[in-house]
């Protein structure tokens, strides 16, 4: 420091007119022979200006390629820094089209340093565990379809012996029978047996009532023979159909005979054409039903 000040404090050694205005500033015209006083009065500005100007002249961008190709963060433009930041963000969130870190043997810039800063490599590696942790949630996702399937199975109606299903063909294909769980005719029913027998009774009556109502509708249509919309409206105004099921102990047997509805309609239509009630005509042609008090077959 002392040697530098001694050099700068000797303006008389430098020839006037060459570097005097660069190092020491302009000389006052009032006293051109006293450069030491001018140097003391402007010591602060004159000390800061020559250093900056000398550094600017020394590192000229047009003359030195090393200064332009520097990999310093201060010299990088925003366009160069944005793709690098987006790549690090994409790598931290998960797998994607993010750029992989440069290989150790890749191209390097001037000065032996790579253009990609090494501090961003841990961010890329930090995103790898997140990407590998995402498949861990696949089993949880895989359980959702199974839960949905189980919910569908629970919502579906359970098959019962009553034969009440959505499709008529499946309902008519099942034979109806009361529960055989009670050990004796006088044993009290459990709530499950009572509910089962109720469903069977309603299904049997529904089969017979549907058959009788269909036959009554056919007879009523054949008697009226509507040909226009006005005739149909008049028929609907006068239509009154009452169905009476009088089967008694033969209820289940008669209902099981109606498994094939076409055959049952033909039999009932023939009996109705002869002038006999359909229910009584069918009852005379069949054997008596088994009593409810008789021992039944064991529960399947």
Curated annotation (Swiss-Prot):
Domain of life: Viruses
Position of sequence motif Nuclear export signal: 232-244
Keywords carried by this UniProt record: Host cytoplasm, Host Golgi apparatus, Host nucleus, Phosphoprotein, Virion, Virion tegument
GO CC list: host cell Golgi apparatus; host cell nucleus; viral tegument
Biased amino acid composition, Low complexity: 269-292
PTMs per UniProt: Highly phosphorylated in the host cell. Packaging is selective for underphosphorylated forms.
InterPro entries registered for this protein in UniProt: Herpes_UL49 (IPR006908)
Biased composition (Basic and acidic residues): 10-22, 50-61
Primary localisation category: virion
Cited function: Tegument protein that plays different roles during the time course of infection. Participates in both the accumulation of viral mRNAs and viral protein translation at late time of infection. Modulates the RNase activity of the virion host shutoff protein UL41 probably to ensure necessary levels of key cellular mRNAs and proteins. Plays a role in microtubule reorganization that occurs after viral infection by stabilizing microtubule network.
Family per record: Belongs to the alphaherpesvirinae VP22 tegument protein family.
Name of the protein in question: Tegument protein VP22
């Amino acid at each position: 420091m002392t040697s530098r000040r001694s050099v700068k404090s000797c303006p008389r050694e430098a020839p006037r007119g060459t570097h005097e205005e660069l190092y020491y500033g302009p000389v006052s015209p009032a006293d051109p022979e006293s450069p030491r006083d001018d140097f003391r009065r402007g010591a602060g500005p004159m000390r800061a200006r020559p250093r900056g100007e000398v550094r600017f002249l020394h590192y000229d961008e047009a003359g030195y390629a090393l200064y332009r190709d520097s990999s310093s963060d201060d010299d990088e433009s925003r366009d160069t820094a944005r793709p690098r930041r987006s790549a690090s963000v994409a790598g931290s969130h998960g797998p994607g089209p993010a750029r992989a870190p440069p290989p150790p043997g890749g191209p390097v810039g001037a000065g032996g340093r790579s253009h990609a800063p090494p501090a961003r490599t841990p961010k890329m590696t930090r995103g790898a565990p997140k990407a590998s942790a995402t498949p861990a949630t696949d089993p949880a996702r895989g359980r959702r379809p199974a839960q949905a399937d189980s919910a569908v199975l629970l919502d579906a109606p359970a098959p019962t012996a009553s034969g009440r299903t959505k499709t008529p063909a499946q309902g008519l294909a099942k034979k109806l029978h009361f529960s055989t769980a009670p050990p004796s005719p006088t044993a009290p029913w459990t709530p499950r047996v009572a509910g089962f027998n109720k469903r069977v009774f309603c299904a049997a009556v529904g089969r017979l009532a549907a058959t009788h109502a269909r036959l009554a509708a056919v007879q009523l249509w054949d008697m009226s023979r509507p040909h226009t919309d006005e005739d149909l409206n008049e028929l609907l105004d006068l239509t009154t159909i009452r169905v009476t099921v009088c089967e008694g102990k033969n209820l289940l047997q008669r209902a099981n005979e109606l498994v094939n509805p076409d055959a049952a309609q033909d039999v009932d239509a023939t009996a109705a054409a002869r002038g006999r009630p359909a229910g009584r005509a069918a009852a005379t042609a069949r054997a008596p039903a088994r009593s409810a008090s008789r021992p039944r077959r064991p529960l399947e």
